[in-house]
Amino acid sequence: LYFGKERAGMFTRLATSLVLNYLRKWDVASCNRVNKFVAISRYIAERIKKNYGRDSDLIYPPVDCSYFKPGFANDGFYLMVSPLAPNKRVDIAVEAFNSIDLPLIVIGSGQEEKKLEKMAGKNIKLMGWQSDEIVREHYANCKALIFPGVEDFGIVPLEAQACGKPVIAFGEGGALETIVSLD
């Protein structure tokens, strides 16, 4: 359960502890009945190995590269496509772009929308939810995609790359399997 920076009350902590204890026992019992684990990334395969001591087959999620065509335009803006949730770390991108005063467009909606609207400087545009066509158009016209979250895999960076755009990502999680470092 995610409580953000707020401290949960004693009753909530106790109830959460009991529920999590039950879920751990159920998880261990359930995993022992699994014939074959399938992971969507090496990152997840490593977690399966660590938590359950089991190997897994690796099958990456697909991206429709015929839908996402390379775009050679560069309208000078950076792009972030994400649900606006705490674990997606959109706030970190907004803070960073506020400090460097470069244009950032954020496509997505969610529980952090109001907070991010208050944080965003004049160089940051929050567009809310958009259709696939609008997202594709923005991929094709952006300078680069910003991806600060730690994801199990991360389809968004692949969609941007299918449009010929570079990705600036946090160096952890599944993104490390699809993004080559410039080091």
Where are these regions (language model features)?
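Conserved donor-binding/catalytic core segment of Leloir-type glycosyltransferases
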Residues: V38, K69-K88, V94-I105
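Short glycine/proline-enriched, acidic/aromatic patches that form the donor-sugar handling elements
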Residues: V135-R136, F153, G173-T178
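Short acidic/histidine- and often glycine-rich active-site loop of Leloir-type glycosyltransferases
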Residues: E159, E172-D183
